[in-house]
């Protein structure tokens, strides 16, 4: 075989391989879309129920007054541990 024949054969194999890969990818895309539609049809997402009471975005000031001694005690405990290490 001459170089020209080998080159032509290589081009033919390359085009055939690229065509096969393109065909396979197109089939794969359609299969995934069909499976996605089937899953969404037979297993729909459950609807989210809203919470009974909205969660307040800000802690009421009365709660901060109750937490202040706890925070002070935690800071003091942490500082004592840091000094002992």
Curated annotation (Swiss-Prot):
So what does this one do? Catalyzes the decarboxylation of oxaloacetate coupled to Na(+) translocation.
A single MF term (Gene Ontology) = oxaloacetate decarboxylase activity
Q: Name one GO biological process term.
A: sodium ion export across plasma membrane
The record's principal subcellular location, in a coarse class, is: membrane
How does the annotation summarize its subunit structure?
Heterotrimer of an alpha, a beta and a gamma subunit.
Q: Which residues cross the membrane?
A: 15-35
Q: What is the lineage of its organism?
A: Bacteria, Pseudomonadati, Pseudomonadota, Gammaproteobacteria, Pasteurellales
Listed cofactors: Na(+)
Q: Does the keyword S-adenosyl-L-methionine apply?
A: no
HAMAP family named among the record's database cross-references: OadG
**Protein name per the record:** Oxaloacetate decarboxylase gamma chain
Give the catalysed reaction(s), semicolon-separated.
oxaloacetate + 2 Na(+)(in) + H(+) = pyruvate + 2 Na(+)(out) + CO2
Q: This protein's superkingdom?
A: Bacteria
* Pfam family for this entry, one: OAD_gamma
